[in-house]
Regions:
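Short, flexible beta-strand-to-coil junctions
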Residues: 33-34, 81, 96-101
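Extracellular/luminal low-complexity segments enriched in Ser/Thr/Pro
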Residues: 69-87
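Surface-exposed binding patches on compact interaction domains or structured appendages
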Residues: 1-75
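Context-gated lysine
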Residues: 8, 15, 27, 80-81, ...
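C-terminal edge beta-strand
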Residues: 103-115
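Functionally constrained cores in energy, signaling, and assembly domains
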Residues: 73, 94, 115
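Residue-level detector of solvent-exposed, low-hydrophobicity positions
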Residues: 56-57, 97, 112
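A short beta-strand micro-motif common to beta-rich folds, especially ectodomain repeats
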Residues: 86-100
C-alpha cells in the first residue's frame, strides 16, 4: 500500500485517519466499497465494518454475516457463526483513500471469504 501511494510505510501510517473519517487533504482514510460504486465511511464494527452478504456496510445482527476491522494498517476479518452460511462466498472491498492536492488515490483490497 505504501508503494501504491508512493510513501514509506511509516509516513502512510502517520497520515492514517481513524475509521469513520471522511476523505480530507493529506490524509489516508479507510472506507468500504459498496456494490453501487460508492464508499461507506461510518464504522459499524470495532474500528471497521460489519457487512451484509452482498458486501455492503451493515450492522451487527441477523443480516451481517462478515466483518473487517483495522488497527493501524493491520486488518482483521471474520464471520459471525449462525449468520454466515456454510459454503456461501462473501466479497468485501475495504479501500484506503489518500487525498493529495484535491485528487483522491484509492487502493482497494478485495477479500474473498468462504466458511
Amino acid at each position: 500500500l505504501a508503494q501504491a501511494f508512493v510513501m514509506k510505510p511509516a509516513v502512510l501510517e502517520s497520515k492514517l485517519a481513524s475509521v469513520g473519517t471522511e476523505p480530507a487533504e493529506d490524509k489516508v482514510v479507510i472506507a468500504l466499497g459498496q456494490t453501487d460504486g460508492t464508499f461507506a465511511y461510518t464504522s459499524t464494527a470495532n474500528n471497521g465494518f460489519w457487512c451484509e452478504a452482498n458486501g455492503n456496510v451493515g450492522n451487527w445482527g441477523d443480516t451481517a454475516p462478515v466483518y473487517v476491522e483495522f488497527s493501524g494498517l493491520t486488518m482483521t476479518y471474520g464471520h459471525r457463526k449462525g449468520v454466515s452460511v456454510a459454503g456461501q462466498k462473501y466479497m468485501l472491498k475495504p479501500t484506503l483513500i489518500y487525498t493529495r492536492n484535491g485528487v483522491q488515490y484509492k487502493a482497494t483490497i478485495v477479500l474473498n471469504m468462504q466458511f
